[in-house]
């Protein structure tokens, strides 16, 4: 029997949400270019949903906004929090209207076994390590231009100078711990910091643990 050429199945994905707080495209362009200059790898090619709940109805040219974002190599898959008028604009632009998931209690499906990967060497520029459904422990340094990613937490017993992304599947309890924090970028469940954010907290080039506090990152120094 010939296997069907396509199947429709339900699934869930973690998407980053870009909150649009004004209809002023010049202002959006200015702020967007600043963020892209800080961390281009974090945004470019990543699927995004536009949250339009803060936009005054009838003021935003959604087609022009989409063209602006696409010109910066951003991938827009839909909108949320849109008024009826903006939803019609979204439909004309080929964008889906996405509703945020409700926090209902559902039976938990069988989960994959939790894993921990241990790396006993330096992670060098150009290298990427990803741990699915687990934690990453590194006994060594993560150099400039290197990326370490885990669905769970990341512990680095050495210097972090590259990028570290924990909670890649949306796990908000994930943490990033390093003996020497001097990263290009740190991200937990889609919230990110650059080196200057750590400088404001006085922990640059020191040991520390980064975690989520509500919807913002926070860091505490550690006596490592």
UniProtKB/Swiss-Prot annotation:
Keyword entries, A-Z: Cell cycle, Cell division, Septation
Ranges in coiled-coil conformation: none
Keyword Cell cycle: yes
Pfam families xref list: MinC_C, MinC_N
Gene3D superfamilies, A to Z: 2.160.20.70, 3.30.70.260
Gene Ontology biological process terms, A to Z: cell morphogenesis; division septum assembly; regulation of cell division; regulation of cell septum assembly
InterPro entries, sorted: CAP/MinC_C, MinC, MinC_C_sf, MinC_N, Septum_form_inhib_MinC_C
Role according to the record: Cell division inhibitor that blocks the formation of polar Z ring septums. Rapidly oscillates between the poles of the cell to destabilize FtsZ filaments that have formed before they mature into polar Z rings. Prevents FtsZ polymerization.
Family: Belongs to the MinC family.
Subunit structure: Interacts with MinD and FtsZ.
Protein name: Probable septum site-determining protein MinC
Species, as recorded: Shewanella amazonensis (strain ATCC BAA-1098 / SB2B)
Gene that encodes it: minC
């Amino acid at each position: 029997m010939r296997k069907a050429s396509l199947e429709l199945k339900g699934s869930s994905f973690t998407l980053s949400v870009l909150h649009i707080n004004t209809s002023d495209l010049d202002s959006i362009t200015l702020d967007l270019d600043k963020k892209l200059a800080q961390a281009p790898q974090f945004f470019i090619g990543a699927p995004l949903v536009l949250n339009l709940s803060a936009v005054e109805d009838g003021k935003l040219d959604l087609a022009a906004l989409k063209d602006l974002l696409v010109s910066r190599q951003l991938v827009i898959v839909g909108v949320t929090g849109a008024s009826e008028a903006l939803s019609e604009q979204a439909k004309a632009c080929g964008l889906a209207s996405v509703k945020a998931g409700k926090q209902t209690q559902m039976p938990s499906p069988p989960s994959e076994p939790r894993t921990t990967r241990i790396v006993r060497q330096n992670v060098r520029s150009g290298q990427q390590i990803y741990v699915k459904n687990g934690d990453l422990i590194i006994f060594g340094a993560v150099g400039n231009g290197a990326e370490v990613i885990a669905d769970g937490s990341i512990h680095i017993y050495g210097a972090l100078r590259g990028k570290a992304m924990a909670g890649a599947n949306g796990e908000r309890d994930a943490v990033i711990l390093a003996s020497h924090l001097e990263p290009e970028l740190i991200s937990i469940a889609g919230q990110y910091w650059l080196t200057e954010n750590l400088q404001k907290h006085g922990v640059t080039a020191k040991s520390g643990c980064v975690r989520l506090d509500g919807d913002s990152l926070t860091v505490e120094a550690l006596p490592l």
